[in-house]
Amino acid sequence: MTPIDQALNLTQKTPSLYEAHFTKDWYQGRGVYGGIQLGLMLKAAETFINDTDFAPRSMTCHYCEPATEGPVDVRVQMLRAGKTISHLQVFIEREDKVISSSLMSWGRQRDMEAVHTPDDQRILVPKKDILKVPHVDRMPVFCKYVQFYLESMSPPYLGMGEPSIKGYCEFIESSPLTFPVLGAMLDMWWPS
């Protein structure tokens, strides 16, 4: 089992209640970084819905207090179950205190015309051709599981135009790209 799979491991207690365990090796500052929390909430929702025709369509996530080491409950509440779309709220809690919560909409695929056409072409430089960022002690603890690749950087306040950072990131030990793993990745790129 890869480190990310271990971090996103859930034990089902009831159909809507799961247990997870936060560990210090995923810390960023005072607690587990938000991507792990988001990944756990996505995994609990996916397990609760138990329908592969449904996929996440929208989501907001709120971090209420530091997610410190130890066991936590992940609780799913169905707000509305529909034939094509369902709305849920997922909570990560410890001793009846909310650590983080997420509102989600999960829906079936719909056939529809695209309403947005990008006005510029994105050219992705292969990661083998850009800087592989070395791990340094000042990085958050969880970065030992992540590899960053930096293509370009224009820091603020240096007169270099609009600030931007462009590159890639991935887990060093890869895992299939599931919705929970993708959720964990959403918060790992340092400008996030």
Language-model features, listed with the residues they occupy:
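Terminal targeting signals and extreme-terminal segments of soluble enzymes
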Residues: 1-192
